[in-house]
């Protein structure tokens, strides 16, 4: 058996191959020496997580409430919502064809809307649709399992239980939702709370009610009937679920006295990201397979997210496929056999001129995110069109000012599977009864927050 070998002197042969192309690529006064590391010093700081104080309202299902952003820290880096989901038991008096489960992406769909305000001026907002899209295109596979655990995609919550069974556990299950506000994207755009002594800063939440999040099915209801059943307190469950402790946590940076003193000495403009969601519109492929939807966004749009949501069950918020989930015993298949993308191709129109003409959904679901997003969704029905070379990058890398455009519209052509499922003729479980859809589109845009004690230009968000 031969032994592996190598020697140092052979490396000098490589060094001797230096020629014209190497002169272009290597050397010179600005060349980097990879074997002598230069330390990039930072200012002195520390970071600490703290819970934010409740300001208004009651943090409960179906309620609006808010927390105050403390100015005790110098920079606000990240915030996250921590919720205790209570156990829910399906009545044991029901037949064994009934099953109960929480909706997929529970923490996403608990949020009807979240906003951050400065003296009641909304600086940024997002909803459950943005949470779905943002996580689908930005959370890498290495973090996906952990993220699913945080937002409630765990078997004890989303797998159906039979009569007498309980969702969750005694004492409830604690879930955590990272709140994707602009200041959490990078420490360079952290919110300088210590420089905002005259602002009342709040994070506001609008929670969905529990009956919009719990799903009851009865497998005895056979097609063309829908298996979804409205939940009646006292018949299906003994009492309405009540959230356990709810907190908003914030991670602050605390800096030196010298840096803190400099924070308020000059005007500072911060390039931020905002989310715009167009009103949802019914999508009825049986009667119109190529509907035209006007989209009225503003500012510098860097990315468009869109999908057709399957709303056959009102509580299935995160289903963007042609079929409804199929429950079999204690499991649920969210993408059953015969489940496809409801959109075959999409046309984007500016001023009666095609910006994109009948581009296949594989472009928006695979090709565009492959080149312009951190990750490709592993789920059916998510679509991205990025004007930016890399939409997750904070630096400007491409955008289009929709405020300068008029008559912008999008035409999502229905797929044959969507047409068949809408008529209840899909032929497979989950699409063998009529499916209902709606079109969802949202945009991520850039804007500027100006932090100043003086006047603010008209097109700026003033945070004085």
Curated annotation (Swiss-Prot):
Keyword tags: Capsid protein, Late protein, Virion
One protein family per Pfam: Capsid_NCLDV
GO annotations of cellular component type: viral capsid
InterPro entries hit by this protein: Capsid_N, MCP_C, MCP_C_sf, VP_dsDNA_II
Subcellular location: Virion
A GO molecular-function annotation: structural molecule activity
Domain of life: Viruses
Disulfide bonds, paired cysteine numbers: none
The keyword Protease belongs to this UniProt entry's keyword annotation: no
Presence of keyword Transmembrane helix: no
PTM description: The N-terminus is blocked.
Main location: virion
Function: Major capsid protein that self assembles to form an icosahedral capsid. Represents around 50% of the total virion protein mass.
Subunit structure: Homotrimer.
Similarity comment: Belongs to the NCLDV major capsid protein family.
The protein, known as: Major capsid protein
